[in-house]
Every structure is written in C-alpha cells, then in structure tokens.
C-alpha cells in the first residue's frame, strides 16, 4: 500500500492484511512490493520485518515526513529498515509530499547497500534524476513516480514507472513503456502524450481522490476515501468521466 492505496489512513494490521491478501492472490505470478515507509525508524523496521514475513518480495520506503531528517539521517534510516526487512528495497523520493528530498549523492551512498537497489523518483526534477543515473549507474534501478515523465526517465536509463494512471488504463501505460524498450521511441512519445488528458483528470484533486472515483465509475469497487480525503467536486467528477470516455475506457 502506498499513496494511492491510502496507507496513511490504514492501521498496521490493515496494511499487513492487504499485503498478505495480495501475496496469496498473485501466487508468485508477479512480485509484490509492499509500502512500509514511516517517519519513525523503529516503527518502520517493525513494519518492514512484518511485511517480509507476509511474503512481500520487496519494500517501497518513503522518506521520513513531518519530522524529516538530514541526508545522513536518511542513510541511517533506510539502512536500518532494509536490514530489518531483509528483502530488496526501492526508495521513494516524493518531496512534494514529505518535505524531504533524497539528494543524488545520498542515493549513491544508499545504493552501496546490497538490499537497496531501486528508487521511485517523484521529485519531478529531471536534472536530479539524470545526476542519480550518472552517479549510481546499474547499482540503482530508477522508476518514474510521475505518469507524465515516464519516457524522459526511461531515456535516462529508467526501468519503468510506479503509476497512478495504470489503475484505470494499465494497457496504455504498459504499451508506452514497452514501445520504448522495443526501440520505438516515436510510439512511446506518442503514447506518453496520449496519457496527458487522463493524467490531468486524475490529478485534478489530490491523489488518490480522482483515481478512486474513476475506478468506481469503471466498476472496480475501490470504495470511498477515508477522511481527511473527501469526494471530488461535481465539476471534477464530470472532468474525470469525460477523460475516461475520451480514452475509450467507458463503453457506450
């Protein structure tokens, strides 16, 4: 569970139950990456260990939020959580939400740990991502955390995207990445641009409000958001529905 899965309003018990349910459901067909981030290192270590015990294949660890820390603190925090979990780790850099950025030099230091081998980059700063790629090379797999920057990050050696749009249009996001990997950059760029109206609709309010509404419209029982998140406005509901229809996701 991450941002889109509303992990911030789930209890540990709910989060672990969701991980276990997913592990059992996919039955090794695809890896299960469990969100286990925390701004309390001791709590994060416990959650990392329990997530691994539930059968997760890897952990997605966001930077500490609110209390934050120094770059040296980030190294200590993530190192402790990686060792507590004992399974591969993807770092999650989303300073717009946490108020804390993983500097490229810090990413390089963390990439030396044998279990820390990926980063979800949602800083929106392409120059920073380029520096991470240059400093870390193959030691750190880069994944876009922004749906509107998939192709730019792939062009810098990125391995894919951890996506919001894919919750409603998985084939579109997959095809964009696959086209790039197949060497058809023109098609990849075209599909990246094709995603823009959906991206604008799915971020017309804070994520995951719009995407959960969209999933419910499409017949997926995503339920309601928990407070403090509320339903989208009527105007935004209409915008989301129009974008889904334009993308061919709502069948007449």
Give the positions of each predicted feature.
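Active-site beta->alpha loop and helix N-cap motifs at the rims of alpha/beta catalytic domains
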Residues: 1-99
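Ligand/cofactor pocket segment of small-molecule handling proteins
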Residues: 56-58, 65-159
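Surface-exposed amphipathic alpha-helices with a cationic face
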Residues: 20-27, 49-52, 82-83, 111, ...
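Short secondary-structure boundary segments
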Residues: 2, 63-64, 123, 146-147, ...
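Short functional linear motifs
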Residues: 15-16, 107, 237
């Amino acid at each position: 569970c991450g941002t889109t899965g509303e992990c911030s309003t789930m209890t540990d018990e709910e989060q672990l139950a969701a991980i276990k349910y997913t592990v059992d459901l996919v039955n090794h067909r695809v890896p299960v990456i469990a969100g286990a981030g925390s701004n309390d290192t001791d709590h994060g270590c416990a959650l990392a260990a329990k997530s691994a015990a539930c059968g997760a294949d890897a952990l997605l660890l966001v930077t500490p939020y609110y209390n934050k820390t120094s770059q040296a603190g980030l190294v200590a925090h993530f190192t402790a959580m990686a060792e507590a979990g004992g399974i591969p780790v993807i770092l999650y850099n989303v300073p717009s939400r946490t108020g804390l950025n993983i500097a490229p030099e810090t990413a390089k230091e963390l990439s030396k740990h044998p279990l820390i081998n990926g980063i979800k980059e949602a800083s929106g700063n392409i120059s920073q991502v380029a520096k991470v790629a240059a400093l870390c090379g193959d030691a750190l797999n880069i994944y876009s955390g922004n749906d509107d920057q998939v192709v730019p990050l792939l062009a810098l050696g990125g391995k894919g995207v951890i996506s919001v749009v894919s919750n409603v249009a998985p084939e579109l996001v997959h095809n964009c990445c696959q086209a790039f990997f197949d060497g058809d950059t023109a098609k990849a760029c075209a599909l990246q641009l094709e995603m823009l109206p959906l991206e604008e609709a799915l971020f017309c309010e804070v994520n995951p409000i719009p995407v959960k509404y969209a999933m419910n419209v499409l017949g997926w029982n995503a339920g309601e958001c928990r407070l403090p998140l509320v339903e989208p406005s009527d105007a935004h509901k209409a915008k989301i529905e129009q974008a889904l229809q334009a993308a061919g996701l709502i069948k007449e």
